[in-house]
Amino acid sequence: MALMIFSMVFMFILLFKPLVFSMMNKKCLNSTYTSTVKWAFITSMIPLMMYMNSSKEIIILNWHWLTVHTIELKMSFKLDLYSITFMPVALYVTWSIMEYSTWYMKHDPHLKRFLNYLSLFLITMLILVTANNMFQLFIGWEGVGIMSFLLIGWWYGRTDANTAALQAIIYNRVGDIGLVIAMAWFYKNSNSWELQQIFSLGTTSNLPLIGLILAAMGKSAQFGLHPWLPSAMEGPTPVSALLHSSTMVVAGVFLLIRFHPLMSNNSMIMTTILCIGAMTTLFTAICALTQNDIKKIIAFSTSSQLGLMMVTLGINQPYLSFLHICTHAFFKAMLFMCAGSIIHNLNDEQDIRKMGGISKTMPLTASAMTIGNLALMGTPFMSGFYSKDLIIESMNTSNINSWALITTLIATSLTAAYSTRLIYFVLSNSPRCNSVINMNESDNKLTSPIKRLMLGSIFAGFLLSNFIQPVNMQNMTMPFTIKITAMLVTIMGVIVAMELNLMTQYMKMYPNNYNFNFSIMLGFFPTIIHRSVSKSFLNFNQKIATSLMDYMWLEKIVPNAVVMMNNAASATTSTHKGMLKIYFMSFILSMVMLMLIMS
């Protein structure tokens, strides 16, 4: 236990070292960041090996922060299966991304600040994962959010980057409302934010659980709060790789995994998670099919896999969801790094229709992208297979909503379709780019990280699946057709994608084809939420300001009131028409009649 605590403390000291050096204005080489994360990864393997040997969880109570009324806030770390396993995965992936960043961002004048931001991004995620109380978890949660804002908007001179960063932070604020509601409820009812005391409540109200679901929807870009995820591609590619693999987007799913003991017996909450995940995985898979931006295709694949993780939670399998988080991190980071390498060599071209033939000019990148897409599809014996196949089997053998099962199977097939489309357009056929472009992948800072993640994409699933077992015992026997369901839908997706890709070579496409507008326009969510709703509010407020207030004040009350008063006075004074003879005769007649009456 002492060795585990020492290795944890040493790991955090290593991660903070380059940050402290940069604050002290000491010279810190770019390679220092990479080597620091590498040694932190090696150190994090010690608790993992100790846990694999003993299977004992520990809680480290280090420092008493403060006391508010009857609640004590302590800095405490929970080292269980989730945190001990996730730390080496996150550090291994970040080690590769850090080294890749020194190549990708080498011409950026603020590279050291960029590496500091990446380090802080990693540290806040590790704080979130290892937190044993909700206050500490909230610090990591908000830290991940603010670092994503800074990194997505790194190129702050571009309007699109600033808008994307604002989208990310605003959508996450919506999710944060749910987390704050859950924290307030737990504080009121359990008088503690320690996870053990919260779990000891047993049954809880639906309110905090719905708050946790809302928080996960915002952070993990679930259906309804998803538009920020494709927009986040405006940031540098290393940011996309880290954001989508092992930090921010999986934080929401990890939150639900951490609080799964409170939800496991609540059928309404589990069904809600299941339906949200099923809608997300299908909708984003459909959107990925018709995108032409290579980074956005990979981004939508991330969102689809996050939906699959939510579906897994909805069928009461948190361990399988966590296994998919870990295996997904390797090949998703590698796919983004391959995309960045291709974009960099094609002079910032991101349209897959203007690529092609990359396998001949950049063989390592092409091989890595092929392996990454195969792992994403769940090809047997790739890392994605060990989690994805188990998830589909668990869904087939559980009492699941049939709609959610069919939706997830269709999304799995579409995953194979857009992955095949990506390989077909980017890697195969002849080049469709400018022939003057000089392509190369000779830099070790590019090739070494991709090779490391390639190994992880092949072997990580086998290694992790050996000690992350399903929480519920699976059927030892099942029909052969159910056993191969995942493979069948994947093969079907590949065949359909190949047929469609070949068909487009001979089919005349009309420019004004509106059949794909729903998918291309991302279900019209950005148009409706960002344009139509805001425009209607602006028009409504403008009408109140101009048509109601200005019209009443400037036309009815002040100028028109004066005019009306003048008209009334004028009408009153103009009743005398100046007919003196008639007036005099009327006066004489009235006087004569009065005298006659009086006499």
Swiss-Prot record:
The chain crosses the membrane at residues 1-21, 41-61, 79-99, 114-134, 137-157, 166-186, 198-218, 237-257, 269-289, 297-317, 323-343, 362-382, 400-420, 453-473, 478-498, 509-529, 578-598. Pfam families: NADH5_C (PF06455), Proton_antipo_M (PF00361), Proton_antipo_N (PF00662). Keywords: Electron transport, Membrane, Mitochondrion, Mitochondrion inner membrane, NAD, Respiratory chain, Translocase, Transmembrane, Transmembrane helix, Transport, Ubiquinone. The keyword Mitochondrion applies. Its main location: mitochondrion. One of its GO terms (biological process) is ATP synthesis coupled electron transport. GO terms for cellular component: mitochondrial inner membrane. It is found in: Mitochondrion inner membrane. Its EC number is 7.1.1.2. It catalyses: a ubiquinone + NADH + 5 H(+)(in) = a ubiquinol + NAD(+) + 4 H(+)(out). It is a multi-pass membrane protein. Core subunit of the mitochondrial membrane respiratory chain NADH dehydrogenase (Complex I) that is believed to belong to the minimal assembly required for catalysis. Complex I functions in the transfer of electrons from NADH to the respiratory chain. The immediate electron acceptor for the enzyme is believed to be ubiquinone. Belongs to the complex I subunit 5 family. PANTHER family: NADH-UBIQUINONE OXIDOREDUCTASE CHAIN 5 (PTHR42829:SF2). This is NADH-ubiquinone oxidoreductase chain 5. The gene is ND5.
